[in-house]
Amino acid sequence: MKLTCMMIVAVLFLTAWTLVMADDSNNGLANHFLKSRDEMEDPEASKLEKRACSKKWEYCIVPILGFVYCCPGLICGPFVCV
């Protein structure tokens, strides 16, 4: 019984994964995502996407662990932007 339930869940998961990852011949999904992002009307929402960045030799946290990122063109070395 448990094996049957696991098989059903696995088949449903793989079916959903296949449908989500399927390539749309006319890029229908890609166009919807780009359109909704480009036509965003709320200016406050765009402010939320901007993050403060750390300049060279300033303290940073690895992006996976924290919220302080290095400015464009720099990478977070061992706890400082280089």
From Swiss-Prot:
Localization (cell): Secreted
Propeptide positions: 23-49
GO terms for MF: ion channel inhibitor activity; sodium channel regulator activity; toxin activity
Tissue expression notes: Expressed by the venom duct.
Entry's Gene Ontology cellular component terms: extracellular region
UniProt keywords, alphabetically: Cleavage on pair of basic residues, Disulfide bond, Ion channel impairing toxin, Knottin, Neurotoxin, Secreted, Signal, Toxin, Voltage-gated sodium channel impairing toxin
Cystine connections: C53-C71, C60-C76, C70-C81
Family: Belongs to the conotoxin O1 superfamily.
Miscellaneous comment: This peptide was under preclinical trial by Cognetix Inc under the name CGX-1002 as a local anesthetic agent.
UniProt-recorded name of the protein: Mu-conotoxin MrVIB
Source organism (scientific name): Conus marmoreus (Marble cone)
